Swiss-Prot record:
Chain residue ranges for the region called Disordered: 1-62
Domain of life from the UniProt record: Bacteria
Family of this protein: Belongs to the UPF0337 (CsbD) family.
Biased composition (Basic and acidic residues): 1-15, 27-62
InterPro entries membership: CsbD (IPR008462), YjbJ_sf (IPR036629)
A family per Pfam: CsbD
Coiled-coil segments on the chain, per record: none
Name of the protein in question: UPF0337 protein gsr0040
SUPFAM superfamilies: Hypothetical protein YjbJ
Length: 62
């Protein structure tokens, strides 16, 4: 299990949310989109780690 990878993904998600909110607050659509993109990246990283964990569990049960 990649706890470090999950922590990095969570940090990226929080950073993306903050960046999106700041972009909204300052009426900067580019900054908002960059924040949303970071959140999508973080979500993908979490899903990747979920799949890796599931694969390890499946292998352990064989």
């Amino acid at each position: 299990m990649g706890i470090d990878k999950r922590a990095e993904a969570t940090a990226k998600d929080v950073q993306g949310k903050a960046q999106e909110a700041w972009g909204d607050l300052t009426d900067d659509p580019k900054l908002e989109l960059e924040g949303k993109a970071k959140q999508v990246e973080a979500s993908a990283e979490h899903k990747k780690e979920d799949l890796k964990d599931q694969a390890h569990r499946t292998i352990d049960n064989v």
